[in-house]
Amino acid sequence: MSDKILRIATRRSPLALWQAEYVQRRLIACHPGLRVELLPMVTRGDVILDTPLAKVGGKGLFVKELEQAMLSGSADIAVHSMKDVPVAFPPGLGLVAICEREDPHDAFVSHHYTSVDSLPQGAIVGTSSLRRQCQLSARRPDLVIRSLRGNVGTRLGKLDAGEYDAIILAVAGLKRLGLGDRIRQVMPAEESLPAVGQGAVGIECRLDDIQTIALLAALNHSETACRVSAERAMNTRLEGGCQVPIGSYALLEDDQLWLRGLVGSPDGNEMVRGERRGPRADAEKMGISLAEELLENGARDILAAVYQGNPPA
């Protein structure tokens, strides 16, 4: 492999580049002498910033160009934020490694307030996520939730300009960019259940590229992979897309997995929650079982109502 350059397809945003450079460093540390280069790309999700993701095709807009680069042979792997990775992959591609997870919780960011509960009535809160919007609205129906797109720096800039009283971002993204001091509160999962895979970095690759898959094995973090597989199994069974508020969060203690999930309406008026506990070996089964319980308890009707207006991407 010493003569070959391993090329990483990545988005150009600061956070995406951080993730790609992290994988680059890890690969070189694990395989001294390996040559690794980045192939930064602009995706449709980076270009369409004036429309909520749910209306323009969902988070898959952030990965399609990267996948095309791998299929064409111009890139060998793609590095993704796991919360942006759709449940299905194009033929010939697959997820081959998940790196150790950063804090998966949501972050409350504000200049004048310390938490959602401290916000005054009618305060303006920015978020690009229907999952966050749903849980915020259920907790504080008096708040005004406004769409907020763009990279982390752009979103913080809009808060700093006074367009919002507070914004909700991912703790992981802020920490990775050295902006952890902007976090006023790490929101507990009981208040804001994280997104599927939030805080984890995944590596996608051509499934016939055995040599590259072998190189990536050292980067896979088994505990994170177990937790994310349970969360993604739930989402897959729900056929969840960006148009529906879905949260899923798994914790692993010793060999016992605790998986929580929710499906809600965007306005927060309807919300179905559930949880499962069991051995880590049953991670995917637990995800499927929890999804089926949620569907039986009302999630099916919520999903149908939302998709009637926005067919899944």
UniProtKB/Swiss-Prot annotation:
The modification S-(dipyrrolylmethanemethyl)cysteine is found at residue 242. It catalyses: 4 porphobilinogen + H2O = hydroxymethylbilane + 4 NH4(+). One of its GO terms (cellular component) is cytoplasm. Keywords: Porphyrin biosynthesis, Transferase. NCBIfam families: hemC. Its EC number is 2.5.1.61. The gene is hemC. This is Porphobilinogen deaminase. The keyword Transferase applies. The porphobilinogen subunits are added to the dipyrromethane group. The lineage of its organism: Bacteria, Pseudomonadati, Pseudomonadota, Gammaproteobacteria, Enterobacterales. One of its GO terms (molecular function) is hydroxymethylbilane synthase activity.
